[in-house]
Amino acid sequence: MAWAGNPHHKNDANRSIAWEQFATLTELDGVDFFSLQVGPRAADCAGSEVVSLEGQLNDVAATAAVMTVDTAVAHLAGALGKPTWVLITAMPDWRWQLSRTDSPWYSQVKLYRQDAGKAGWPKTLDRVKQDLPKRLA
């Protein structure tokens, strides 16, 4: 999982999700979560049950699935054909297009579009939490 993009990206404040919100995805029992987050936000998950793989993971292909915001992680996992869930803003980068839940670029990507405004992240995360047990069944 990765919850934040490059802090220098012009749209980072919109496309990244605060760890405190994103961490609600890890409340599912019986599932191990691993952080693919790099940079200054990698330490956000310290003290949680999420295992940080920063500097340890040599191959994203070794993951079962990836949940991420719109970052390079999404594109790498998508290009590798990994099942990838990308949480995108209501007005995302052009690559994700509008009104789609899939990606024309990556066949294994599912898009979770934010409801309008930052207040929409909790609703988006709720949709992911509802779908996650189905994905793992």
Labelled PLM ranges:
Residues 1-137:
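Catalytic machinery of carbohydrate-active enzymes
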